Amino acid sequence: MAATEVNTYPTEEMRSLSLSGHVGFDSLPDQLVSKSVSQGFSFNILCVGETGIGKSTLMNTLFNTTFENEEASHFHNGVHLRPRTYSLQESNVDLQLTIVDTVGFGDQVNKEESYKPIVDYIDAQFENFLEEELKIKRSLYNYHDSRIHICLYFIAPTGHSLKSLDLVTMKKLDSKVNIIPIIAKADTVSKSELQKFKIKIMSELVSNGVQIYQFPTDDEAVAEINSSMNAHLPFAVIGSSEEVKIGNKMVRARQYPWGVVQVENESHCDFVKLREMLIRVNMLDLREQTHARHYELYRRCKLEEMGFKDTDADSEPFSLQETYVAKRREFIVELQMKEEQMRQMFVNKVKETEAELKEKERELHERFEMLKRTHQEEKRSLEEMRRDFEEEMNTFNRRKVAAETLQSLQGSTGLKKDKEKKT
């Protein structure tokens, strides 16, 4: 279907002009900052990892607070996602933080479909946002954006290679969410083994085509630090809710008989690198990548399923009006077909019901005739029994009369004999 022709005008070369005085639009950045601060920000983290691998502890350590935490058992029948939303404030900036935990992940004997509930949850958040966008009266200003901005994938510190479950899950998620792989409980592996493990993980991710989040290097302000941090992936982290006294200050650390592992000591683990990259440097980029890349991919696929597209078969631009008319025509045809199917189904159902009623009527009629014949036979039988009984009664009465007559005759004869004897 060809698009309606639209008049186009030649674009003149843009000219640069100098201002003769102050106008005021240099305050736009300040206005934007003020508006953003007043609205607040949202950030949604998905934590994927086995039960007991340290997801909750790391979240507490990252945001320097204690979140609600329910102990999860290892005996769940399947994987279910548990979102928790918190309101945080630092200086005058409000952050609505949502942490989504994958309860029961990796606990089943059959782990083949453990990734499905995670994929379904991410898609459901995209679908909710798309439905809000497509409303006639949208309220995106007040809409709570629950789309996942980052997936922290916790890798067990085996020191050998990635599990097949990890590879399959990350492969299913990499087109839907920004993934940062992290090695949990890194203090259980020696430094040399940890470095070999990092190289092995990255090699397996590349060979299996898993796309993880790369810190952006197109912004000169953060290009250098992001480029250097990309070389440190995956981050080997340690979480702790305990504070240990080192020298004259208290630090977050884990106390062992052989020594102390400091969470924020970069020679001990990559926790500081993760916090800097995730929160201080790239939080905005993670939000933008979620909207511009992952959500747009989901939105495009959904709209194409609904019949919307940018060009037709001849690569001509498609107008929204033409798409609407075409979809409306398809809908009307489909509706008519469904109405005809429903009408035919109704007619067939009526015919079936009529046939069933006629069959029931025939069965009832046959039963009635049978009962009628049975009744007539019983009536004839009773009539015969009545006649036989009446005949027996008549015979009995006749015999009774005869017996009484005979008895009376015998009685009168006896009286005569008695009189004759007396005389």
From Swiss-Prot:
G4 motif as annotated region, ranges: 184-187
Protein name (database record): Septin-8-B
Annotated GO CC locations: cell division site; microtubule cytoskeleton; septin complex; septin ring
Gene: sept8b
Segments of this protein annotated with the region G1 motif: 49-56
Presence of keyword Cell inner membrane: no
Positions in coiled-coil regions: 338-404
CDD domains attached to this UniProt entry: CDC_Septin
GO MF, one annotated term: GTP binding
Domain of life of the source: Eukaryota
GO biological process, one term: protein localization
Region described as G3 motif: spans on this chain: 101-104
UniProt xrefs under PANTHER family: SEPTIN (PTHR18884)
Keyword Nucleotide-binding: yes
Domain spans labelled Septin-type G: 39-305
Family that this chain belongs to: Belongs to the TRAFAC class TrmE-Era-EngA-EngB-Septin-like GTPase superfamily. Septin GTPase family.
Binding annotation for GTP: 49-56, 104, 185-193, 239, 254
Keywords (A to Z) from UniProt: Coiled coil, GTP-binding, Nucleotide-binding
InterPro entries (UniProt xref): G_SEPTIN_dom, P-loop_NTPase, Septin
Listed Pfam families: Septin
